[in-house]
Amino acid sequence: ALFYTDINSLGYPDFERGPGGMQSQKDKGFSLKARLFKEGECYGLDYAFCEYLPNVAVGLVDFAGTSLTASEYVVASKSFGRFDFTAGLGWGALGSTDNIGGNPLSILTDKFDQRGSGYSLGLMGGVPGVSTWFRGTTSVFGGVEYVIPKARFYPVNSKIKLEYDSIDHELADFCRECEGDRFESLDSPISLGYEVIVNKNLNFGLY
């Protein structure tokens, strides 16, 4: 996926405005996600527990250049009837709350203890920040959703979502160099959402 952001809380030199001219920070990013295992699949092996295996995926968010919103994650999801549960480990912005007190990958090497930002490492746009991936503080995130079936008195399929946010919006890299107003801390890491399912490609939501 490709995305482009305009961050008003970060300044950037604007030479067309003359000496000292500034504009808001413009930043593009790329994200990747790969599914490692499919829910209920044992890939040719016949084990009784196969039906209980979850989807497992690994992802990189804003993985190149300045990496202001960079995150990496490993996540699993499993459906039980109308419920769908998700839980994962996140690094970077997703790991900024440090809610497990360290990085489990540090048992392999202490290089995973520290994480630099794209700015601090001097990375240019489009250059993958491999030296930062899966490093630094780590946090657990997760959520659950429930599908509300269509009924005579309720003529749409919809979902209720509950999410635990592992991003510290004051400490995440995209705000460490903020100028002026900073992001306010959240009253709660718990978010609630509601989605109407129009078809398999289109949902409308309120969060």
Regions found by a protein language model. Name each.
Residues A1-A64, F80, A93, I148-S158, ...:
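Transmembrane beta-barrel domains of Gram-negative outer membranes and organellar outer membranes
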Residues S24-F30, Y52, L68-E72, G136-G142, ...:
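Residues that define the transmembrane beta-barrel architecture of outer-membrane proteins
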Residues L60-W91:
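Hydrophobic, well-structured mid-protein blocks that either form specific transmembrane helices
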Residues D84-G193, I197:
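Outer-membrane beta-barrel transmembrane domain signature
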Residues K200-Y207:
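Short, intrinsically disordered, charge-balanced linker/junction segments flanking boundaries
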